[in-house]
């Protein structure tokens, strides 16, 4: 059984805008999965449909085998969602907010788990502070805690580290990775592509409501493997190297190469042409390169 099953998901709004156009994929139990795409790709619309906040025009979504429409209660008990927008109740402390959230799911005597969440998310010294007095980063931590309060097997994180400082980001991911090791399925959307690259087993990419890529992180990176070489030259780039040249915003020359053999050829050619290399910066292809290339297709 898949933790998440999405089949032919279509969402068309009343004005005729097609937010989702036949999206289908599965996420396995225990997987750390990334759902990526530019603004307007349909990611949040899909997450809203998963959470039962909006209905699909057609198609089916199941969470841990439970249909989100036909078996809504069981599906929602199986899913925890951290929304993109900051949503909080300004009248309660952090602990009170989590206790009320437990009550929404019919959970009693949940204080031990609430304490564990509070500690692991770095909220211990803010537990009795009113949420309206918290910083934006702290409020986002509370939202993560609320999504976890009913111990859902599937956790959706929609831009969880937006506006969060580096130290918290590291502690948050350590906590989430520990939950994943315990068997929780994690579905992440983020514009920090380095996070998706380092954390996720598989990656799906959406564009204009359509799924345009779905593969393991390793395979996606391997398919677009290569080197970016940034050169500051004293002289002109030889003509036989211009096929590798990419657009650059400054005085540097940017080359896109396949491997280190091509790099050796470039340096040898520059040497024979009498072109001095004043500075060189080398980076290997990362997920951002793959993402940009796929989105441009």
Q: Where are these predicted regions, by residue range?
A:
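Conserved ABC ATPase signature
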Residues: 130-134
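Conserved ABC ATPase "signature" region
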Residues: 99, 103-126
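ABC transporter nucleotide-binding domain
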Residues: 173-257
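Conserved catalytic motifs of ABC-family nucleotide-binding domains
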Residues: 151
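Short, charged/small-residue-rich alpha-helical element at the C-terminal edge
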Residues: 226-297
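Catalytic Walker B motif of ABC-type/P-loop ATPase nucleotide-binding domains
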Residues: 155-159
């Amino acid at each position: 059984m898949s933790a998440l099953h999405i089949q032919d998901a279509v969402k068309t709004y009343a004005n005729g805008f097609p937010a989702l156009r036949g999206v289908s994929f599965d996420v396995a139990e225990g997987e750390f999965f990334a759902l990526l795409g530019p603004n307007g790709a349909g990611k949040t619309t899909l997450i809203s449909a998963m959470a039962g906040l909006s209905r699909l025009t057609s198609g089916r979504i199941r969470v841990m085998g439970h249909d989100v429409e036909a078996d809504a209660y069981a599906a929602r008990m199986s899913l925890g969602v951290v929304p993109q927008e900051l949503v909080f109740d300004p009248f309660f402390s952090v602990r009170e907010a989590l206790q009320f959230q437990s009550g929404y799911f019919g959970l009693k005597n949940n204080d031990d788990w609430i304490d564990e969440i509070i500690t692991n998310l770095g909220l211990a010294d803010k537990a009795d502070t009113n949420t309206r007095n918290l910083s934006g980063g702290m409020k986002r931590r509370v939202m993560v805690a609320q999504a976890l309060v009913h111990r859902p097997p599937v956790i959706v994180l929609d831009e969880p580290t937006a506006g969060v400082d580096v130290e918290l980001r590291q502690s948050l991911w350590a906590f989430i990775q520990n939950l994943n090791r315990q068997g929780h399925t994690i579905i992440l959307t983020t514009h920090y592509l380095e996070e998706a690259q380092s954390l996720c087993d598989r990656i799906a990419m959406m564009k204009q409501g359509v799924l345009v890529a779905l593969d393991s992180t390793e395979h996606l990176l391997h398919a677009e493997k290569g080197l970016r070489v940034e050169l500051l030259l004293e002289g002109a780039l030889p003509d036989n190297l211009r096929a590798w040249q990419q657009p650059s915003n400054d005085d540097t020359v940017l080359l896109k190469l396949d491997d280190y053999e091509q790099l050796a050829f470039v340096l040898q050619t520059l040497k024979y042409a009498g072109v001095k290399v004043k500075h060189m910066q080398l980076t290997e292809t990362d997920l951002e390169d793959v993402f940009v290339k796929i989105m441009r297709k």
